[in-house]
Amino acid sequence: MVIGLSTGSDDDDVEVIGGVDPRLIAVQENDSDESSLTDLVEQPAKVMRIGTMIKQLLEEVRAAPLDEASRNRLRDIHATSIRELEDGLAPELREELDRLTLPFNEDAVPSDAELRIAQAQLVGWLEGLFHGIQTALFAQQMAARAQLQQMRQGALPPGVGKSGQHGHGTGQYL
């Protein structure tokens, strides 16, 4: 028997014949990988605060030329920010961040371009992390919604009363 089910979303008008939406299968298969991504950020509020600060610093570096003292200060802020970020991350993400970020030469003052590149790289990595977390959370939400809908559909078929007798279905009949 073939059953037509609506996916419940009014904006895409998709009807699945056969009972299971292939989009939900993909969500369920990837759920274990994506849920682990949300566990990799141990202190999300701290990571968000530092990420926002780093992004603001990048905008400042782009906006005005920096003198030697400000470039030294920004180099120190960059190194401190990375250490603080690592405190809020699980070991897997710490290792990835360590591989991607190269320390500045302590003997020389970094140029404006070096600082911009380092800050942009860090901002890009953080934005990728945030997008990955958002995607994982969305996938979890979709999987939970699909599971709830399956539970609702299995509860009582339309037109069946409490005692198992067929009653009137819902809706208007002409």
Swiss-Prot record:
Name of this protein: Bacterial proteasome activator
Positions of region (Disordered): 153-174
InterPro entries (alphabetical): Proteasome_act (IPR019695)
Record keyword Protein biosynthesis present: no
GO cellular component: peptidoglycan-based cell wall; plasma membrane; proteasome accessory complex
Motif segment (HbYX motif): 172-174
Subunit structure of this chain's protein: Forms a homooligomeric, either hexameric or heptameric, ring-like structure which stacks co-axially with the proteasomal alpha-rings.
Biased composition (Gly residues): 161-174
An example Gene Ontology molecular-function term: proteasome binding
Gene Ontology biological process terms in this record: positive regulation of proteasomal protein catabolic process; protein homooligomerization
